[in-house]
Amino acid sequence: MADNTGTLPNVDAVLDTTGLYCPEPIMLMHNKVRDMTPGQVLKVIATDPATTRDVPKFCQFLGHELLEQDTASENNYLYFIRLA
């Protein structure tokens, strides 16, 4: 994962999975990336702590680039993913 804090590219789509728990955030991400094209950036907002483990594995498995993983607040997690 690159350390690009403050230099993230424009976001092409946002997926808000607030309030959802495993496996729903990953299932919704999988569906969302199908509607996007390679090179686009997806911002994911989550509240499930399991996403800190699941999102990086999702990216690694599918070849997407996890540009940034951040804890926006105690209960909010942000992910910026460039699609492969």
Enumerate the predicted regions with their spans.
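Short, compositionally biased "basic patch" segments
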Residues: M1-N10
